[in-house]
Amino acid sequence: MLVRAVVVSFMLAMIGISSAAVAAPARPAVQVSMDDYFGDWQGTATAMSETDEDFPTSKRDIALTITKSDIGGFLVSWSTLQRQKGNPKAPLEVLKSTTVEFVPAIVPNTWKAKAEVDPYNGGILYWARLDGSGLVISSFTINGDGKPEYQTYRRRISGKDMRLEFSNVTDGKFVRTVKGALKKLRSR
């Protein structure tokens, strides 16, 4: 019975549902709109690695811009200044940036990346949804060694504050989680 509970919890975590959410009584959903997300955001986060012995935790600086597109979608650009390589006492700073344009999908409040990609050839498949848990952007790719990689960025807002939760699962194993807070600098 315990094994079954662990397996169910893991499967729910893989699709982004906590066991508390399944067991909790329904609460009225806070109405959020994509308009609330449009703008420039900046903040910090802490990354926790399940696989990196030299950097089990590390700090990151985050910049995020979300702008409305003229076709009912949006453009999201984020940059992360990571400190998780080199000497743990003096880590190297590595800037990683990503920009993805999303267009409406068939289901309301869902979007898919405008660019058509093939995850079998190293392309990253992106999709997004807006629901009671916030703006969730997910990605999937197949690494060069054939192992699947699934990433989820969950962004929740309250006024000018944003909470970020990120998870990276490779070949069924949690590699890294990131939690952070951002402030809205300006609306777009």
What are the roles of these predicted feature ranges?
Residues 39-45, 60-62, 162-164, 178:
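One face of beta-strands
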Residues 25-42:
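N-terminal helix-cap/turn-to-beta initiation motif at the start of protein domains
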Residues 1-5:
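Positively charged n-region of N-terminal signal peptides that target proteins for export
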Residues 24-26, 149-188:
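Edge beta-strand at a domain terminus
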Residues 6-17:
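Bacterial N-terminal signal peptides
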Residues 45-143, 148-150, 185-188:
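Central antiparallel beta-sheet cores of small beta-barrel/beta-sandwich binding domains
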Residues 19-23:
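Sec/Tat signal peptide C-region and signal peptidase I cleavage site
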